Amino acid sequence: MRFSIFFKVVALFMITLFSFGAFAYYFVSSQISHENYQNEMRHYQFVTTINEILNNYSDYRAIEDYLYKIGFRETTIENLEKVLAKRRHQLHHRNIGYAEVFKFSDMVFILLKKDEHFVLYKDLHSVSYRNYFLAITVGLLLILFLFLFVLQSLLPLRELRSQVKPFAQGDKSVSCKSKQKDEIGDLANEFDNCILKINAMNESRVLFLRSIMHELRTPITKGKILSSMLKEELSCKRFSSIFDHLNMLIEQFARIEQLASKNYGSNKEKFLMSDLIDKIEKMLLIDEDKESPIHVSSSNYIIEADFELFSIALKNMVDNAIKYSDDKQVFLDFIGNNLVVSNKSKPLKEDFEKYLQPYFKSSNPSQAHGFGLGMYIIKNALEAMGLNLSYHYSNGRICFTIHDCVFNSFYDLEEDNEELPPPPPKI
């Protein structure tokens, strides 16, 4: 379970607040109990002293002076009559003076029997717990201030997060500039600088690619115009085919660039395998008059993918399979919903994941060649369409499997009376 940093800060604040409250309650309770015990012992000491004076000297003047010094004053409280009634009855049976201490409504009194009447003295010293509660209040305010201070310091993280998400989704107009003078502010400003640099690099890259494509298309267009003026029909067709192929390569280059920069929008559709093979043969400039090195178990299967992107991926797979096979042949078979591309060759010497890296070179001198950008393009193209690629070696063949790309077969569609999708435009 994942928790945000704000949740953790709030949870920490609540735990701190609860711990402080428990500690404050325990501390104040123990202090109050201790002070009450000390006051009780002090008052009983007063009464003991007064009773000794009465027993030995019966000097009421000295007792009054003593009570005055320790902070007791004579008082009369009418609402204490019922409380004192029982004590008066007990004190009437004593022949000599007697003093007793008691509490009433959080006030301390000393009841003194003086001859045949009673005098009530009240303790003017009041017990105050204001300092304890003041300390608790200051502690709570300090914890609250620290919590708000930390929370305010972390708020730019939420704003930075809200800016990072649109930037990751392709919005290059976000700004993360911060005036905060701490680590979070530095992080936001560095990220803002990074956005500016990335935008500048993207603009430079787009300008560079557009310039190259423009400079390449201009001579290609001129070449096509000049080739159309040739009188010999065969030469005219050959030159026209060459320029068409160059133009197609430029378009492929643009799609590959979009794919590498994660700016390509995949558009899945259904198309026949035969149409896909026709386009791949034209992309590889395979002569129609000669036997094709591409062997398909059946051309009646229907593929569900982005036609242009899938053709680029499969073209690179077929090209590598022909180039590195022992017999310069490649085989396309269908197993369930998977398309298997295989050729006769020795198994890969390195881990398959290494071949997916751009310009990978084998460490084995006997296999010093690599696949260039081919496998890298294949991997990214298939991932853009949500397809997976796997490798295995079986019966003397290297087999690459594209999973879950086969929709159905043409015959199955005819049995289900489904309408066949129109073929994609041919080049």
Curated annotation (Swiss-Prot):
Residues 211-398 form the Histidine kinase domain. Disruption phenotype: Deletion leads to a decreased urease activity to one-third of the level of the wild type. Displays also an exacerbated stress response that results in enhanced and accelerated biofilm formation. It is found in: Membrane. The chain crosses the membrane at residues 3-23, 131-151. The keyword Phosphoprotein applies. It is an enzyme of class 2 (transferase). Keywords: Kinase, Membrane, Phosphoprotein, Transferase, Transmembrane, Transmembrane helix. Residues 151-203 form the HAMP domain. The modification Phosphohistidine is found at residue 214. The keyword rRNA-binding does not apply. Member of the two-component regulatory system ArsS/ArsR that regulates genes involved in biofilm formation and acid adaptation by acting on major ammonia-producing pathways. Functions as a sensor protein kinase which is autophosphorylated at a histidine residue and transfers its phosphate group to the conserved aspartic acid residue in the regulatory domain of ArsR. In turn, ArsR binds to the upstream promoter regions of target genes including ureA, amiE and amiF to positively regulate their expression in response to acidic pH. This is Sensor histidine kinase ArsS.
